[in-house]
Regions:
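Alpha-helical membrane-embedded segments
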Residues: 120, 159-160
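Membrane-embedded, hydrophobic transmembrane alpha-helices
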Residues: 2-4, 8-16, 22-147
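Alpha-helical transmembrane segments and their helix-start/interface "positive-inside/aromatic belt" motifs
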Residues: 74, 149-158
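Alpha-helical transmembrane segments of multi-pass membrane proteins
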Residues: 64-67, 157, 238-239
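Active-site lumenal/periplasmic loops and adjacent helix-entry segments of GT-C-fold
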Residues: 160-258
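Short secondary-structure boundary micro-motifs
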Residues: 41, 67, 155-156, 168, ...
Length: 258
């Protein structure tokens, strides 16, 4: 799990500091980096669907405001709440299997139990609603009030999503097996990528800093766990990092607009 960071001035490894005229790059771990991303996509979809059901308790199902398209409230709320619920569930289960069960691959159990549980909950809620309502309910009755305004909003958030995605992948991306990061932020990415890989390629439970063994974590790390878990599920690191970052920022802008 060695990472090689080459800047315009120095080459950093986990054991040495070498003068180098090279470019900024990080050699990518060639495990799940080359794998499929389907399980990672399923994870995000399950999180969004679970969050949609849970967030209705906060946003109020069936409520509507004249002229306001509440879909821009529902979408980010679903993503945010769902990611929190599913990711914490997977982390706690994985922690239990690692610390108590002494499992060598705790994320396997965490993801199987967490994702299966989320799917079961979603199915049970859907069946219960279908029976209570006596059929399928029109999904957009309370979420879309102004269709003319909706077209402009879709254009706005579509352009924002394209720009933010470009910005994220411009700074952090993988090309030919090499993980590149921006000139002014590569130093910050070193501990972040190490934390991600400590989950996707390691067993960092109880969680501690990869760079400072034995010290408990005093810095928020659940984003790194989420990204590492998505990479564990087969999603390439840059996709995992940038997709979550893009969705989070676009969701924040949707809430700000709403």
């Amino acid at each position: 799990m060695n990472l090689l960071l080459i800047s315009k001035d120095f080459c950093y490894t986990d054991t040495c500091l070498i003068k180098s005229p090279g470019r900024i790059e990080v050699s990518a771990w060639r495990g799940n980096v080359q794998g499929e991303i389907m399980l990672g996509i399923i994870y995000l979809l399950l999180a969004g669907m679970l969050g949609c059901e849970a967030s209705k308790m906060l946003t109020g199902e069936g409520r509507s405001v004249s002229g306001i398209n509440r879909i821009w409230l529902i979408l980010p709320a679903s993503f945010g709440v769902g990611i929190l619920l599913l990711t914490w569930t997977v982390y706690i289960i994985s922690w239990f299997f690692s610390v108590v069960g002494k499992a060598e691959n705790p994320l396997l159990y965490g993801n199987i139990i967490g994702m299966t549980g989320a799917a079961v909950i979603i199915i049970l809620i859907s069946v219960w609603k279908y029976k209570r309502q006596g059929g399928c309910r029109n999904w957009n009755t309370d979420k879309i009030q102004d269709k003319r305004r909706l077209k402009k909003e879709i254009l706005l958030f579509g352009l924002l999503t394209v720009f933010i995605t470009y910005m994220m992948f411009y700074v952090f991306y993988i090309k030919d097996g090499i993980l590149y990061s921006g000139l002014t932020v590569y130093g910050d990415y070193a501990p972040h990528t190490a934390m991600m890989r400590s989950f996707s390629a390691g067993n960092n439970f109880p969680t501690q800093y990869p760079h400072y063994g034995g010290a408990d974590v005093k810095y928020h790390f659940m984003f790194q766990f989420l990204t590492g878990n998505l990479e564990y599920l087969g999603m390439r690191m840059d996709f995992a990092y940038n997709i979550v970052s893009t969705l989070s920022l676009v969701g924040f802008l949707m809430l700000l607009y709403q």
